[in-house]
Amino acid sequence: MVTTPDGMPVAMVHSQNCTSDLNAWVNLFRENLESFGVKVDTNTLYGTLYNKALEGDADCGGLLPYCYFSGEHITHFEEGRPLFARTPDSKFTLANFMRSHLFTSVGALKLGMDILLKEEGVVVDKLLGHGGFFKTKGVGQKVMAAAVNAPVSVMETAGEGGAWGIALLAAYRKNKTEGESLASYLEEQVFAKEESVQIAPDPKDVEGFEAFMDRYKEGLEIERAAVVHLH
């Protein structure tokens, strides 16, 4: 059984893949700009492209990427192939392209969360986002809120990712007072002076994400064929 360091039960969804494929595309866009003699710093590049995603169609205009650099146990893949597919009448714009890659970055995670939220009746008051996905303010946060249909909060430390969270757990084990719960320690010792920003899910984004996921699940056979035939 998985628990927090103070013994509280944990429901955990783990996915293998997230933004590796998206990062590869961002680097391709950087290479394209540099071919024209344009230099752009990393934060500006990511910020501009991530924010572009907010201009896209709610369902990503019919685009379908998979970010499977490796296998994904949630969808029963032992190997992965990053790929991008569309139909002739898909709305192939930069905004939809970026939006679809942000959506698919948490696609497998959403499938796992749907089991907890829709099948097992788990109720989420809010999520606290950490990691590079949330580094561009408001974008990954808005996408995640749509994915889980729940408010998502981020703090200034959001970009620090998992290593920061692990350090907090270690600090709790070392510094907690007798009987002090992890929740109390985090609230009173760690987050008391930290400002957070919360974004509620936009119903149109939620509906769009569900439509994207219908396409995602239907297209898994495309990914499976790529694993078999692309070497």
Functional labels for PLM-detected ranges:
Residues M1-L128, F133-H231:
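Active-site core segments that coordinate phosphate-bearing ligands/cofactors
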